[in-house]
Amino acid sequence: LAIAMSDSVIQCQEAFGAFEGKKKEPDLRVMMGLWPNVVQIVTTEDTGIKTFADIKGKRVGVGAPNSGVELNARMIFEANGMSYDDAKVDYLSYGEAIDQIKNGQCDVAFVTSGLGNATIKELGTMKKIRFIPIDGKAIENLTKKYPFYMPYSIPKTSYDTEVDTPTAAVMNVMLVDKKLPDDVVYDILTGIYSEKGLATIGASHATAKREIKLDTG
């Protein structure tokens, strides 16, 4: 069993992106979807950055090399018609990038996580934060080329910002090998989706209580 973001899983299955040049892994199977990892591109009001285009020439923490955050950052630059060459990119984890924002050494941090991220909240106690939107042509480009992304929104109540911010998200999934016996899969899912299992998961994080609507169309 493993937990991974769906974008990383597809890249691994089909050997592209971070897995370019490696063998394909067609035996990977998603057993269940878990929670949305929300792309949160955070900056502070004193930078003057309001749109993705404003990132040009700025200091941007994009995540550790080939991490889930960094893979998201690379694709989102692409969706906006830009590349890392357009900014002063630093391969920092989002915690490190946010620390540098506090110290005035970084302008923007890519964070891919559930909403209510503690490091972003801490930054918000020190500076007025703002999220850079992913909308319009950018979200259209992103979801068309990489359909594992979905449009999402960061509610203003999540971090006490002035407005809701349109963005993108990818699902975290529970991953197994296709050789895992069906009865084992059944037992795992039965345990998770039992009344006790759902109560335990729901108590772990606010996003775990949100239902995902299934569309038969």
Write out the residue ranges for each language-model feature:
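A structural signal for short loop-to-beta-strand junctions that line the ligand-binding cleft
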Residues: G21-L34, T157-P166
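Solvent-exposed coil/turn segments that connect beta secondary-structure elements
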Residues: S6-V9, P36, T44-T47, P65, ...
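Short Pro/Gly-enriched coil loops immediately N-terminal to beta-strands
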Residues: M31-V38, G124-T125, D135, P166-A169
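Pocket-flanking alpha-helical
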Residues: L1-K22, G95-Q100, L115-G124
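An extracytoplasmic/periplasmic, membrane-proximal ligand-sensing/linker region
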Residues: L92, E96, N103, S113-F131, ...
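Bilobed "Venus flytrap"/periplasmic-binding protein-like clamshell domains
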Residues: L1, G33-N103
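Alpha-to-beta junction loops
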Residues: L1-A4, R59-V60, K102-V111, M126-R130
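C-terminal lobe and pocket-closing loops
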Residues: R130-D187
